[in-house]
C-alpha cells in the first residue's frame, strides 16, 4: 500500500511538472520607453498558422498553455504600434515600435511622453513640425522643459546639469553649439534623467539631485556629416553681408563640429561659448580679481535690439570614444567683437537727509573684445574606475572706451591669460570608494585705466588719471575622499588643501586653506537623509589673519513613487571676502568711483533653509514645482557709501550688520500634444530687508517684488502662436517711506501662418514701464518675416523694428536707489537670409 501511495505522488508531480513546462510566458513592452503594454494581442504561430492567442495583463505579461515546438513564432499587435513577429525563446520580451496609421480616417499614435523610473522620455517626432529649424525650436515645445533666451535649458524650473547627444558631451556645457545647429528633422527623442549620476562607479552609491538631458538622433542622421550655410544680406547704413557655416557629425563613438561666423546684425556670437555647467568634477581653480569697472553692454531685454556690433567667431570641437569606452576630446575657439552702445542714466539714492541724492550719466561706449581658448580632455567612465585629465588655456583682451557728456573719456584695458591642468580619479573597491582630485593653475593680467578730459586745460589736469596693475596668480588644490557603505548608510570623509599666491601692486598675498568635510547619509526607495558638517581653516599671510570657518547642512527628502516628492534642507556657512576686496588698499575703478579696502578680513555667516515639492504626471504631460526659501546673512563689515558732487566713494568699515530674504515660487507646465498645445505658468514673490551705510549713518531698507509669467505655445502644422508674458511689481522702502509700486510688464507674441511651404510670421514685444516721477513708457517693437522652405534650402526676408523705434526707457529699484535708464535701439532694417542644408 505504501508503494502505491508513493507511486501516485510521483505521478501527480510529473504531470504538474509537464503542465508547468508547457506554459509559454513573456512580456510586451514599448521599445522606446520600456513601459509595459496592457491588452496587447499575442498569437502563437506554428507552421504559419495561429494555434492560440491571449491578451497581456496590466503589467504587459502573458502566458500561453501550449507545449513549445521548434520553429514556433509570436505575432503581436497593439493599436498605435507596428505588427511584430519574433521566434519563441527563453526570454520572450517583445518590444513593439510605435507607428502612426490610418484607421477609418483617424490617426492613432503612441504616447508622446512616457516615464521609466527617474527618466522622462519625450518622443520628439510628436512635437516637431516642418517649420522647426533646429533642436532648440523643438525643445521649447516640451511640457516641463523651458529654453531661456541665452540658451539655458531648464526642467520644472531647475537648470539641467548635463547635456549630451547620443550619450556624449561634445559641447562641455556650451548648449548653444548643439541646440542651434542640430536640425529639427534629425532628432528622435529626448531623455530627461532626474537624480542624474553620470559616473558609473558611483551609481546606486552616491545619490544626486542633478538633472541630465540626452538627445537621441534618428538612425538616418546618426554618424552622417552635414553642413549648414546661412549667408545673409542686411540693408542698413551701410548695407553689408554676413552669416555662418557649420559642419557637424554626431555618432555614438565619434562626434565633431566646426563653426565659422561673421555678424553685424546684433547677434551675440559669444553665446555659442556660454558655459551653463562645469563639465568636469575637479578641485576648484582660482579666479583673477578685476580691479577696474570695465564697461559692458547693458541690456534690460533682447540684446539683439541694442547691440551695434561687428563680430566674428570660429570654433572646432572633436570627441572620440574608443573600444574601452574611454573618451578623448579637443576644443578650440576664437572670437572677436566690436560693440557700440549709447545709454543715459539717472540714479537717485536715499542716503539720509530730507532730499534724494541724484547723479546722471550720458555715455557712448565702444567695446573691443578678443578671446581665444583651447581645451583637451581624456575621460574614463568604467564600472569601477572614473577619471579625467584636462589641460586648458585661454587668453583674452577687452578694451572699453567710454565717452561721457562734458568731454570726459575713459579707457579700461584688461588683457589676461589663464593656464590650468587638472586630474581626478575615482575607484570602487568593494564597499569603499576612493577619490582624489588635483589641479594647478596660473593666471596673468595687466589691467590699465586711463582717464582724460577734453573740456579745457585746467579740468584736463584735474581729471586726467592713469593707473596700471600687473597681476600674477598661482594656485593649486588637492582633495582626497573615502566613502564607505554600511547597508543603506554611507559615510564619506573628505580632506582638501589649497595654496593661492596673488602678486599685485608689488605685494604678495598668500592664502593657505584646508577643509575637513565628513558626511553621513541614508538612502532607500522612500527616504534620503544627509548630514555633512565641515570646517575650513584659512590663513591670509599678508593680512596676518587666521580664521576658522564652520559649515554644514541637513537634507531630508521623501519620495512618493514616481509622481511626487518633497525635500527640506537647512544650510549654514561662514566665508571671507575675496582678493578683490582686500588685496589693494585704495583704487579708482572708473571715472567717478573710488574704493577704500578694509584693514581687516571681512567675514560673513549665512543661514539658508529651503523647502521644495515636486509633482508630475508624464502620461498627462503635467509637471509642477513649488519652492520657498529664506536666508539670513550676518556680516562683520559694511560698505559705507558717500556721494559728493556726483562722485562715489566706498569705504569698508568694521560694523556688524544683517540682512534677510524670503522667496517663494510656483511653476506649472501642461501639454496637450494631440492638439499641439503647451502652457506654462510661473509665479514668484520676494521680500528682503537690510541696511545701507552712508557717512556713518545707518539706513534700513526693505524691498518687495512679485512676478507672474504665463506662456502659451500652440503649434499645429498650419500655424503657430507663441505668447510669453512677464508681469512684475516691485517697491522699496528706505527709512520710513515706501516708494510707489512700479508695474512693469513685457508681452511677446509671435503668430506664424503656414501656407504649404511658406511661413508668414509677425512678432511683437510690448514693454510697459512705469517711470519714476513721469508718465509710463510703452514701447512696441515688431518684426515681420516670410520664410520659403524647400527641400534643402530655406529662404527668408525679414523687416526688423517695423515702427523704427529709437529709444527704450525703464525704471528699477534697489534697496536704497531708484534708477532710470534710456537705451538707443537699432533702426529699421531689412534682412535677406538663405540657409543651405547639405
Where are these regions (language model features)?
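Structural motif
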Residues: 27-37
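A short, solvent-exposed loop/turn motif at the edges and junctions
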Residues: 44-49, 73-87
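Outer-membrane beta-barrel translocator domains and adjoining extracellular loop/strand segments
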Residues: 203-205, 269-275, 340-357, 391, ...
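Membrane-proximal, glycine/serine-rich, low-complexity loop/turn segments characteristic
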Residues: 20-21, 31, 59-61, 82-92, ...
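Short sequence motifs at beta-strands and strand-loop junctions characteristic
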Residues: 235-239, 302-310, 362-370, 411-417, ...
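Short, acidic Ser/Thr/Gly-rich low-complexity loop/linker segments typical of extracellular
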Residues: 49-61
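Face-selective signature of the C-terminal outer-membrane beta-barrel domain
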Residues: 311, 319-337, 365-543, 550-552, ...
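Conserved C-terminal beta-signal and adjacent last beta-strands/turns
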Residues: 705-729, 735-838
Amino acid at each position: 500500500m505504501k508503494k502505491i501511495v508513493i507511486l501516485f505522488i510521483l505521478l501527480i508531480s510529473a504531470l504538474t511538472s509537464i503542465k508547468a513546462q508547457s506554459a509559454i510566458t513573456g512580456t510586451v513592452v514599448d521599445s522606446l520607453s520600456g513601459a509595459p503594454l496592457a491588452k496587447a494581442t499575442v498569437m502563437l504561430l506554428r507552421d504559419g498558422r495561429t494555434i492560440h492567442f491571449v491578451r497581456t495583463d496590466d503589467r504587459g505579461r502573458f502566458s500561453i498553455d501550449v507545449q513549445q515546438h521548434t520553429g514556433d513564432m509570436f505575432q503581436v499587435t497593439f493599436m498605435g504600434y507596428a505588427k511584430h513577429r519574433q521566434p519563441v525563446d527563453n526570454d520572450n520580451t517583445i518590444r513593439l515600435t510605435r507607428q502612426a496609421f490610418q484607421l477609418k480616417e483617424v490617426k492613432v499614435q503612441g504616447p508622446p511622453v512616457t516615464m521609466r523610473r527617474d527618466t522622462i522620455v519625450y518622443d520628439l517626432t510628436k512635437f516637431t513640425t516642418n517649420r522647426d529649424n533646429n533642436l532648440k525650436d523643438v525643445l521649447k515645445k516640451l511640457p516641463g522643459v523651458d529654453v531661456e533666451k541665452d540658451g539655458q535649458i531648464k526642467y520644472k524650473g531647475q537648470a539641467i546639469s548635463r547635456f549630451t547627444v547620443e550619450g556624449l558631451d561634445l559641447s562641455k556645457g556650451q548648449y548653444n553649439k548643439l541646440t542651434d545647429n542640430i536640425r529639427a528633422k534629425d532628432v528622435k527623442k529626448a531623455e530627461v534623467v532626474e537624480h542624474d549620476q553620470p559616473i558609473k562607479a558611483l551609481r546606486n552609491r552616491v545619490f544626486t539631485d542633478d538633472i541630465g538631458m540626452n538627445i537621441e538622433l534618428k538612425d538616418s542622421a546618426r554618424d552622417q556629416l552635414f553642413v549648414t550655410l546661412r549667408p545673409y544680406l542686411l540693408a542698413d547704413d551701410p548695407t553689408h553681408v554676413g552669416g555662418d557655416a557649420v559642419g557637424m557629425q554626431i555618432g555614438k563613438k565619434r562626434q565633431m563640429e566646426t563653426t565659422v561666423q561673421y555678424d553685424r546684425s546684433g547677434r551675440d556670437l559669444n553665446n555659442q561659448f556660454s558655459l551653463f555647467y562645469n563639465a568636469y568634477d575637479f578641485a576648484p581653480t582660482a579666479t583673477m580679481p578685476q580691479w577696474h569697472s570695465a564697461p559692458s553692454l547693458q541690456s534690460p531685454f533682447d540684446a539683439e535690439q541694442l547691440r551695434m556690433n561687428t563680430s566674428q567667431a570660429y570654433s572646432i570641437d572633436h570627441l572620440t570614444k574608443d573600444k574601452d569606452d574611454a573618451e578623448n576630446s579637443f576644443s578650440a575657439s576664437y572670437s572677436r567683437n566690436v560693440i557700440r552702445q549709447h545709454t543715459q542714466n539717472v540714479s537717485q539714492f536715499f542716503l539720509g537727509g530730507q532730499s534724494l541724492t541724484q547723479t546722471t550719466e550720458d555715455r557712448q561706449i565702444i567695446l573691443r573684445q578678443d578671446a581665444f581658448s583651447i581645451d583637451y580632455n581624456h575621460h574614463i567612465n568604467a564600472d569601477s574606475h572614473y577619471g579625467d585629465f584636462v589641460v586648458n588655456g585661454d587668453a583674452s583682451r577687452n578694451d572699453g572706451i567710454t565717452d561721457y557728456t562734458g568731454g570726459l573719456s575713459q579707457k579700461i584695458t584688461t588683457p589676461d591669460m589663464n593656464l590650468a591642468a587638472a586630474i581626478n580619479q575615482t575607484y570602487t573597491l568593494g564597499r569603499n570608494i576612493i577619490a582624489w582630485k588635483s589641479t594647478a593653475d596660473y593666471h596673468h593680467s595687466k589691467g590699465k585705466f586711463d582717464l582724460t578730459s577734453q573740456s579745457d586745460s585746467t579740468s584736463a589736469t584735474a581729471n586726467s588719471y592713469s593707473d596700471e596693475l600687473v597681476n600674477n596668480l598661482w594656485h593649486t588644490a588637492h582633495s582626497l575622499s573615502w566613502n564607505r557603505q554600511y547597508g543603506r548608510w554611507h559615510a564619506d570623509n573628505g580632506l582638501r588643501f589649497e595654496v593661492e599666491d596673488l602678486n599685485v601692486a608689488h605685494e604678495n598675498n598668500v592664502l593657505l586653506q584646508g577643509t575637513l568635510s565628513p558626511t553621513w547619509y541614508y538612502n532607500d526607495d522612500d527616504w534620503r537623509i544627509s548630514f555633512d558638517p565641515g570646517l575650513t581653516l584659512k590663513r591670509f599671510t599678508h593680512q596676518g589673519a587666521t580664521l576658522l570657518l564652520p559649515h554644514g547642512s541637513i537634507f531630508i527628502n521623501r519620495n512618493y513613487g514616481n509622481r511626487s516628492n518633497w525635500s527640506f534642507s537647512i544650510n549654514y556657512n561662514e566665508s571671507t571676502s575675496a582678493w578683490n576686496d582686500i588685496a589693494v588698499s585704495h583704487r579708482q575703478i572708473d571715472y567717478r568711483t573710488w574704493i577704500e579696502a578694509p584693514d581687516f578680513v571681512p567675514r560673513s555667516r549665512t543661514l539658508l533653509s529651503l523647502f521644495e515639492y515636486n509633482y508630475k504626471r508624464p502620461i498627462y504631460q503635467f509637471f509642477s514645482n513649488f519652492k520657498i526659501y529664506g536666508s539670513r546673512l550676518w556680516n562683520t563689515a559694511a560698505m559705507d557709501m558717500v556721494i559728493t558732487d556726483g562722485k562715489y566713494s566706498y569705504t569698508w568699515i568694521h560694523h556688524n550688520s544683517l540682512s534677510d530674504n524670503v522667496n517663494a515660487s510656483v511653476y506649472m507646465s501642461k501639454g496637450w500634444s494631440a492638439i499641439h498645445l503647451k502652457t506654462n505658468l510661473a509665479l514668484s514673490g520676494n521680500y528682503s530687508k537690510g541696511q545701507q551705510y552712508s557717512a556713518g549713518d545707518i539706513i534700513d531698507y526693505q524691498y518687495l517684488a512679485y512676478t507672474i509669467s504665463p506662456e502659451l505655445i500652440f503649434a499645429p502644422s498650419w500655424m503657430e502662436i507663441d505668447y510669453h508674458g512677464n508681469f512684475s511689481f516691485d517697491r522699496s522702502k528706505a527709512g520710513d517711506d515706501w516708494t510707489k509700486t512700479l508695474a512693469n510688464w513685457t508681452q511677446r507674441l509671435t503668430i506664424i501662418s503656414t501656407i504649404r511651404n511658406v511661413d508668414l510670421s509677425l512678432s511683437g514685444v510690448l514693454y510697459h514701464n512705469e517711470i519714476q516721477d513721469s508718465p509710463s513708457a510703452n514701447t512696441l517693437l515688431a518684426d515681420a518675416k516670410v520664410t520659403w522652405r524647400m527641400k534643402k534650402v530655406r529662404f527668408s526676408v525679414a523687416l526688423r523694428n517695423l515702427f523704427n523705434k529709437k529709444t527704450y526707457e525703464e525704471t528699477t529699484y534697489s534697496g536704497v536707489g531708484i534708477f532710470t535708464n534710456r537705451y538707443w535701439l537699432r533702426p529699421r532694417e531689412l534682412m535677406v537670409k538663405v540657409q543651405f542644408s547639405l
